[in-house]
């Protein structure tokens, strides 16, 4: 029997998809501003990971968590940083 594995079963009722979408929406302003070379790289890798490898945004955020945290701290974006940290604690 071939049953698809849901690696997020432990996140039931944690709204990991909604939280991931909200963090990505907040990060979009940084991507659009392009004030750091990382943002262009991150946007490109997100597209590649989503489309070519089938990874969702939670996984993309997890892959870049230390860098995202550092850049958000440096930029003073405490709101997005708090959202990212909540996502990490509840869903990663």
UniProtKB/Swiss-Prot annotation:
It comes from the Bacteria. Pfam families: CowN. The keyword S-adenosyl-L-methionine does not apply. Is required to sustain N(2)-dependent growth in the presence of low levels of carbon monoxide (CO). Probably acts by protecting the N(2) fixation ability of the nitrogenase complex, which is inactivated in the presence of CO. Keywords: Nitrogen fixation. GO terms for biological process: nitrogen fixation. InterPro entries: CowN. Belongs to the CowN family. The gene is cowN. This is N(2)-fixation sustaining protein CowN. The keyword rRNA-binding does not apply.
């Amino acid at each position: 029997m071939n049953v698809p594995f849901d690696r997020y079963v432990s996140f039931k009722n944690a709204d990991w998809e909604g939280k991931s979408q909200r963090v990505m929406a907040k990060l979009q302003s940084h991507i659009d501003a392009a004030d750091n070379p990382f943002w262009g790289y991150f946007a490109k890798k997100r597209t590649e990971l989503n489309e070519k490898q089938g990874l969702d945004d939670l996984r993309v955020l997890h892959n870049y968590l230390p860098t995202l945290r550092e850049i958000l701290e440096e930029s003073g974006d405490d709101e997005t940083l708090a959202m990212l940290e909540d996502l990490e604690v509840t869903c990663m």
